[in-house]
A protein has these predicted regions:
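Conserved AdoMet/S-adenosylmethionine-binding subsite of the radical SAM
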Residues: 79-254, 258
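Acidic-residue sensor for enzyme active/binding pockets
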Residues: 21, 74, 103
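Non-catalytic surface loops within mature trypsin-like serine protease
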Residues: 14-16, 26, 46, 158-160, ...
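Short linear Ser/Thr-Pro motifs
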Residues: 1-3, 29, 43-44, 131, ...
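Flexible, acidic/Gly-rich N-terminal and inter-domain linker regions that tether
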Residues: 1-38
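Canonical Radical SAM [4Fe-4S] cluster-binding loop centered on the CxxxCxxC motif
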Residues: 26-73, 77
């Protein structure tokens, strides 16, 4: 499936009949300067058991972990296809983004093998961004992996500054609340000297008020964290509404004015 912006979605089926997705994309040029690399976003699980309220994958339930070899296949198959259609750009550096279907930390053994294998064998690999809902006991293991490889960028979902609301959006918060999550992420930064990026998805009428913004600013220590602002994407069974870009810009400007590194 090819989008108007040039990104491509791939759907893979394994020998057990499970489906997963991968996406090839490039970021838009900044100040008319093209980015030097492209991105391949891969899945780490067939389905997911986290059941985040905004995510279609959670509706599938959990089926199976991808093996590290299957994750490597995702990268290799996408790259082979890109070489056919865009050989010049396919030879540049790329990032292997683990932000597709599944919760990576719940498949840590295979994530470990995948990251280690790819990092040691592919000189074109630039970074490995990994996004998690925040499985607190496993964050120290990711810190150890980052210290070995040094190319991991850790993203953690935080979609409300309030525990009660965050538990409604992301049920995992009932097990690991905001305080314990941020504490583990602060320790990750201290152990790796790499800041954690908090992904805050803006949902109209849910977490985009001025009060949310003010309390989010109070919650975030810029010494340990950066922020990535996302806009909710309408799904086939949309429960929420995508906000206008102006809302994200307001959040972005206020965060920056308070010394917090932020991007949209």
């Amino acid at each position: 499936l090819v989008s108007s912006d040039g990104s491509i979605k791939y759907i893979f089926k394994n020998h057990n009949g499970y489906y997963c997705e991968a996406i090839y994309y490039r970021l838009e040029p900044k100040n008319n300067v093209p980015y030097e690399r492209y991105h391949i976003c891969i899945s780490s699980q067939f389905g997911c058991k986290m059941r985040c309220s905004f995510c279609d994958t959670g509706n599938l339930g959990f089926c199976h972990n991808l093996s590290y070899a299957e994750m490597l296949d995702e990268i290799n198959l996408v790259r082979q296809d890109i070489i056919k259609t865009d050989a010049e750009n396919a030879s540049t550096k790329y990032s292997a983004v683990i932000m597709g279907m599944g919760e990576p930390l719940n498949n840590f053994e295979n994530i470990n093998k995948f990251c280690t294998t790819l990092s040691t064998k592919d000189t074109r690999l630039k970074t490995i961004p990994i996004s998690s809902v925040g499985i607190v006991p496993l964050i120290p293991k990711l810190a150890q992996l980052q210290n070995q490889l040094t190319n991991i960028k850790f993203f953690v979902s935080l979609h409300s500054p309030y525990d009660e609301q965050h538990s409604q959006i992301m049920p995992i918060n009932k097990q690991y609340n905001i305080s314990s999550l941020l504490s583990a992420c602060r320790q990750y930064h201290l152990d790796t000297n790499t800041k954690v990026t908090l992904s805050y998805m803006l949902i109209e009428g849910v977490n985009d008020s001025e009060k949310h913004l003010n309390d989010l600013i109070k919650l975030i220590n810029p010494d340990h964290f950066k922020v990535q602002l996302l806009l909710y994407n309408n799904t086939t069974d949309a429960k929420f509404i995508r906000p206008i870009i102006d809302t994200a810009q307001i959040f972005n400007e206020r965060l920056k004015r308070n010394g917090i590194s932020s991007i949209i």
